[in-house]
Structure formats: C-alpha cells, structure tokens
Amino acid sequence: MKKLGLIISAVFLTLGVACADVDRPISVEELPQKAQKFLKAHFSERDVSFAKEDPEFMYKDYEVVLTDGTKIEFASDGEWTSVDCRYGSVPMAIVPKQIEDYLKKNYPNVTVLGIDHERKEYEVRLNNRLELTFDKQFRLIDIDD
C-alpha cells in the first residue's frame, strides 16, 4: 500500500511540474495592470515584440521583450523583477534614488544596463562590467566583475 501511495504521489508531482512549465504567449493587455502602467511610464517609445505568461506551481511570472531587445520580467502582481537593456540603458526613474545617488557619487560616467529586484536585494549591472548588489536598505553588499 505504501508503494502505491508513493507511485501516485510521484505521478501527481510529475504532472504538476510538467503542467507548470508551459509558457503562453499573451498580449500586453493580458499583463497585470501594474505591469502595463510600468511599460507605459518607462518604455512608451518602444514597441513590445513579445509577451508571455510563465505559470509556475503556485504563481505566474510574465516576460516582455521590446523591439530594441530590452527584456523585462514581472511577478504575478505586476511588480517588475528584472530589466535588462541589451543595447541601451535602464531608465534612471526605475533605479531607486539611494542607488542612483551612490552611482552618481562613485561611478559618475557609467550607465545601468540591467537591474534585478528581489525580495531582499537589488542587483545592478553597469556598462563597465561591474555588478553591484545592494540590500533592502540600499547598502552596497557585493561587487562582482
């Protein structure tokens, strides 16, 4: 009986994982309102090339690729989690003021190519190949080159 329970559990786990990893192309209008507002506020001059919904086990993520190669990722609530500008720079309005001030003081001639926002930290990628990590109080906690 224990083996049967393990087999059934394994089957459901496998089905759950398989079903959870099916990306679905979507229109911009299907993004959460918060994500739509973010795109209009910071990237209105660029067209959306592709948008997709990435359902995970307990939540959904969203990914948007703009025609200039910029890739933006959103959490299920529409909050941005990552902005990666391949051929340009991240709009400074996205960068928290404390990080912007730090960059102006310590790296005045660089541009931000990408920024990731996780629950406890921000990671900022600069055009001088440095990656700076800040904690949630915006203190620098790591530099990678």
Language-model features: locations:
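Bacterial Sec-dependent N-terminal signal peptides
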Residues: 1-23, 39
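Interaction-mediating elements
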Residues: 21-145
